[in-house]
Structures are given as structure tokens and as C-alpha cells.
Amino acid sequence: VPEKFTKKMIELLETESPVALHGYSPSLGIDSVREAVAVSLEKRFGLSYKKEHIFMCSGAAAALAHAFRAVTVPGDSILTFAPFFPEYNPYVNLTGAKLKVVPPDLKGFQIDFEKFETMLTNDVTAVLINTPNNPSGIVYTTDTVRELARIMEKKAAEYGHEIYLISDEPYREIVFEGVDAPFIAKYYPNTITCYSFSKSLSLPGERIGYVAV
């Protein structure tokens, strides 16, 4: 846990009122926190995020649950890639949608684009990716993300409806130095980014995450 985080928690406990610390926050999250997240994303990745693009959640799991509900109705499908985090199944099933899984490219665990394009049918309203990936640890390259975006844009135009890209990113910062780890939203405009500080700052018990759109 970062030392600055612990010191700030102690400072807040000593200086803030119990109501401010433990009362209900606004439904979208505390404004100053949303603003800080937006500023950080814009500074690090060069995209024009504003407070209005950020929705605070209880970790990435809640962020994903909200994202799935936002882009599906019963009978729709979400397409993801093997191997994947097993809890995606119940999260999607609760919406009445179906999780379809593209088999892995066993040579390097990047995307098998032939299989992906075949399975990206009209009932798919969102594609779900997780990079760096749990459980494989694979990181999608910039070339992989660009080709993914190209196919999704082509299919969205063909079907006449949006296809959203839901990017599950709790491991975003946990990569080796020099690894090509692109920020997904830079390559596809209809990206819904789901993030958690549980891994990057080792704060799983705090349940702090967000959706960025």
C-alpha cells in the first residue's frame, strides 16, 4: 500500500467530520474524485476526459456489472475471448444476455481474428476484453487492438447499430518495462473502460473503481 495513501487516510480521520467520511456519496461518486480521475486519464493517455465521463463504483466488478446492464437487453450477446475471468459468466447472465467466447489463438494468445469476425454476429452489442489478461497474463499489442477496432467498426456499420468495447483493466499498470500495453480507449471511440485500484495500489479492501466512457 502506498505510504501517501495511508497518511492521507489518517489525515482524513483526524480532520474530516464523520458525516463527510461515512455518509452517502452522490450516486455518480464524489465530484472531486471524478474530476481527479478524469485529469489523470487525460494527462497520462491524452484523451479529453471530463468529470462527466467518470462514474465511481465499488471496484471493477461493480463497474463491469453496470457496463453490462447499460449495453444489453435480454437476448443480446456479449463476446469475449478465452481464457477469461470466470465471474464474467454470472455477471452477464444476470442481465439476461449471453456470453459468447472466442477460442484462443494458441500460438501467442493474441486474438484469432478469423474466429472473432465469424462470431461477431448481429446479436452482439458489446465485445469484452481484459488486457493484461487474467489468467494468462498476456497483453494485447497495439496492432492487435487496432485490428480489433477495425473489425468492430466494420461490423457496426454493417449491422446498423453500435457495438461497444468493454475494457476490463484492473491490471493496466502491472506490466514489465518495455511491454507494448496500449490504452484501449485511444483506438475505439465507443469504449467503456472499467478500472479498479485494487491491484495497482494493492487496495482490494477499499473497493474503489470507476467506469470511464
Where in this protein do the model-derived segments appear?
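A short helix-loop-beta submotif of the ANL/AMP-binding
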Residues: 93-100
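Active-site PLP attachment segment
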Residues: 173, 183-213
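Short acidic capping loops at alpha-helix termini that bridge into adjacent secondary structure
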Residues: 49-54, 75-77, 123, 161-162, ...
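Conserved PLP-anchoring active-site segment centered on the Schiff-base-forming lysine
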Residues: 70-92
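Conserved coil-to-alpha-helix start sites within the AMP-binding
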Residues: 60-65, 84-88
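N-terminal small-domain helix-loop-helix segment of the aminotransferase-like
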Residues: 1-58
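Active-site phosphate-binding strand-loop segment of PLP-dependent enzymes
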Residues: 106-177
